Design a protein with these regions (language model features):
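N-terminal (or domain-start) structured segment
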Residues: 25-93
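Sec/Tat signal peptide C-region and signal peptidase I cleavage site
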Residues: 18-24
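Bacterial N-terminal signal peptides that target proteins for export
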Residues: 1-11
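Short Pro/Gly-enriched coil loops immediately N-terminal to beta-strands
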Residues: 106, 113-120, 207-208, 248-251
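Bilobed "Venus flytrap"/periplasmic-binding protein-like clamshell domains
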Residues: 31-55, 59-60, 119-186, 279, ...
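Acidic, polar ligand-binding/catalytic clefts
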Residues: 81-117, 200
């Protein structure tokens, strides 16, 4: 009897172990590459990871803090993430292998999942700095975003269009949004350029602590960038405390990018569950409210992932 009991127990344990191994083998991971915690990418990435963890069977999903666009795309190419947020111009630079933008080789594994919302070039100066125009930045202390981040690439493009170089500034800091704001609060910086969705937390924080001026980027200056990804736009009045008038600027689209190593089924589910649970994204940040499925494939700088393509065909977005 004891022998049969031991055999039965052994078989049960063996079955449990096999089931456990099978379960572990079935579990898949989605690492969502975002940006700094004070930007828009991070809360959106957290929302996406929550959607995927709940809606896709046997999936564990996390949101990773990064330096945003350029780092995200390089991590995707290396297979160190399944989904990333990036600015359109950074995606184009990565696909071409633009070394000056931080891409030492062509990132040929990148695949598109969806367009999202627009980033707005938001140049904010302290009111007592005397800065009111782009030309006034000359001789001032300015943060241009983390080195080789999407924001910093935008800063280079906008400064060049304005006839400015970093050497024209008294001091250049390569800092994430939150750190830039802290230095401005402490009067160690005069201005910060942040490429983000409207109402970004870092600038809202700054505007409640010190009087600010939102510096305009006129439409003719946007045209001088010479990149169709940059379009004239407006930061509406009262987006930030003390900003009482509309301010002209440039807008650049954001995209969700994956890579060719992600299975067709997983890419299909990532696109599908994002749009079937879009209210979760809308609740994460106001900027996300401009994400619409009908715009999902517009202006995609890289080939669409076959899994995402399957979903968009299924819903009649593409033929």
């Amino acid at each position: 009897m004891r022998l049969f009991h031991k055999i039965g127990l052994g078989l049960s344990l063996g079955a449990a172990l096999v089931a456990g191994v099978a379960s572990a083998q079935q579990q898949q991971f989605i690492n969502v590459l975002t940006g700094g915690q004070s930007g828009v990418y991070y809360p959106m990435g957290v929302a996406l990871s929550q959607i995927y963890g709940k809606a896709i069977p046997n999936v564990r999903s996390t949101a990773q803090v990064t330096k945003a666009s350029a780092e995200n795309l390089n991590l995707l190419q290396a297979g160190r993430g399944e989904l990333a947020m990036s600015l359109a111009d950074a995606v184009s630079d990565a696909w071409r292998g633009n070394a000056e933008a931080g891409f030492n080789t062509k990132l040929d594994k990148l695949r598109g999942l969806s367009a999202t919302y627009n980033n707005y070039i938001q140049i904010v100066a302290s009111a007592d700095s005397g800065i009111k125009t782009m030309a006034d930045l000359k001789g001032k202390r300015v943060s241009v975003g983390a080195a080789k981040s999407g924001t910093e690439l935008n800063a280079r493009a906008i400064f060049k269009a304005a006839g400015l170089a970093y050497t024209d500034l008294a001091k250049v800091e390569y800092l994430p949004f939150g750190e830039s704001v802290e230095l401005m609060k402490n009067r160690q910086l005069d201005a910060t350029l942040q490429s983000a969705g409207l109402g970004v937390a870092s600038i809202r924080d700054l505007a409640t602590a010190v009087k600010i001026v939102v510096v305009p980027v006129p439409a003719d200056m946007v045209a001088k960038v010479g990149d169709p990804a940059y379009q004239p736009a407006v930061i509406p009045a009262n987006t930030y405390t003390g900003q009482t008038a509309d301010v002209a600027t440039a807008a650049i689209p954001n995209f969700l990018i994956t890579h060719s190593g992600v299975s067709d089924e997983m890419a299909y589910q990532m696109a599908k569950q994002m749009y079937e649970n879009i209210d979760t994204l809308y609740a994460a940040h106001n900027a996300a409210k401009s994400i619409k499925r009908e715009n999902a494939v517009k202006g995609m700088p890289v080939p669409l992932h076959p899994g995402a393509e399957r979903y968009y065909k299924e819903v009649g977005l593409i033929k």
